[in-house]
């Protein structure tokens, strides 16, 4: 999306046709292919800033090819364990792969001491400033509808829309 507008269907069709030989040759995953399309679309549209949410997360994520202005790590949980590891420390080590040389990183409040130390170490190795997000963002979810209503510091905001509607997006 750019300014809330979805990529138009014609662009998706043209991209699919143009990328067909690459798809046959490299057999990218669906996420890799849609990331590639999004990056091309953002470049074609000359966006000033793009907010990119990782899929797998970390070192192996297809979004990790970009050099961000800022990286954010909100939380660590047991997801994608077949790729990232079976302990929170192993998963944190993989997810720390998004920390880039001299690029600031924001660490979410839900990280425990052990995983947080993995990110501190990686940030120091990469000479990246790290910042700690405060625990209470003031955002609470009030209703679960297509256009959710959120309360931010006791002020209701209606029709605030997120493509994904989970607690991770609230963070």
Language model segments and positions:
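Phosphate-binding loop of NTP-binding sites
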Residues: 1-100
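Adenine nucleotide phosphate-binding catalytic loops in nucleotide-utilizing enzymes
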Residues: 2-28, 82, 86-92, 100-171
């Amino acid at each position: 999306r750019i300014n809330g507008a979805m990529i138009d269907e014609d662009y998706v069709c043209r991209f699919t046709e143009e990328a067909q030989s690459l798809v046959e040759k490299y057999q990218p995953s669906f996420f890799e292919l849609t990331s590639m399309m999004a990056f091309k679309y953002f470049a074609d549209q000359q966006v000033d800033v793009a907010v990119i949410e990782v899929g797998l997360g970390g070192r192996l994520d297809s979004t990790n090819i970009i050099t961000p202005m800022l990286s954010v790590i909100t939380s660590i949980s047991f997801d994608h364990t077949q790729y990232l590891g079976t302990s929170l420390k192993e998963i944190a080590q993989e997810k720390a792969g998004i920390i880039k040389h001299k690029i600031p990183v924001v660490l979410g409040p839900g990280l425990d001491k052990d995983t947080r130390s993995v990110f501190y170490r990686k940030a120091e190795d990469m000479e990246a400033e790290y910042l700690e997000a405060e625990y209470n963002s003031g955002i609470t979810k009030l209703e679960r509808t297509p256009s959710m209503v959120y309360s931010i510091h006791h002020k209701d905001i209606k029709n605030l829309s997120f493509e994904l509607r989970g607690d991770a997006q609230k963070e």
